[in-house]
Design a protein with these regions (language model features):
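A short acidic/basic microdomain associated with nuclease active sites
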Residues: 45-62
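Hot-dog-fold acyl-thioester-processing enzymes
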Residues: 29-36
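Interdomain/boundary linker segments immediately adjacent to catalytic/signaling cores
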Residues: 1-26
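Nucleic-acid nuclease catalytic cores
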Residues: 85-132, 137
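Intrinsic disorder/low-complexity segments
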Residues: 1-8, 132-152
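Conserved catalytic cores of phosphodiester-cleaving nucleases, focusing on short active-site segments
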Residues: 28, 51, 72-90, 101
Length: 152
């Protein structure tokens, strides 16, 4: 990945984290995930980013497409998957879920954000997509046959 792409990823993840911190500052912990999601959408729109909410992800199983096998909470600028949680602590399954979404979307980075903490900075995990994307399971490749990993 080019340095410019890494910088763009840092800018995008920075905007998402800033939005999350603002939402958490205003609302605090204790609400349902749906409330934080709605407020994150409002906040991210003010940060001038493209967002897809509850994006359906298809899965190919034995040559059969399951159109809405999964739903991400947010995909930001086509390159960052954001999963919101309201849990006492992250579990391994939360990271596994995000890694699956990264694999299926081809996005290079994801953020787990747990709003059930006193300070959101303690409830954020950045997860990198280090897995290869099986053919037919994610976004189509770019013009050179490589998986799409850049922003935008």
């Amino acid at each position: 990945m080019a340095l410019a792409d890494l910088r763009e990823l840092n800018v995008v993840t920075g905007k998402v984290i800033a939005a999350g911190i603002e939402v958490h500052r205003v609302l605090g912990p204790g609400l349902l995930e749906a409330a934080y999601l709605a407020c994150m959408v409002t906040e991210l729109r003010e940060h001038d980013v493209d967002i897809e909410v509850q994006k359906a992800l298809p899965l190919i199983y034995k040559n059969v497409t399951v159109p809405c096998a999964f739903r991400t909470d947010l995909v930001v600028n086509g390159c960052v998957v954001v999963e919101l949680k309201c849990v006492s602590e992250f579990l391994a399954i939360h990271q596994a879920q995000l890694l699956t979404y990264l694999k299926l979307t081809g996005c290079p980075v994801g953020l787990l954000m747990n709003f059930q903490v006193p300070a959101l900075k303690h409830g954020i995990r950045r997860v990198l997509n280090t897995r290869t994307v099986p053919a037919g399971r994610a976004a189509p490749p770019d013009d050179h046959g490589r998986p799409k990993v850049g922003c935008g």
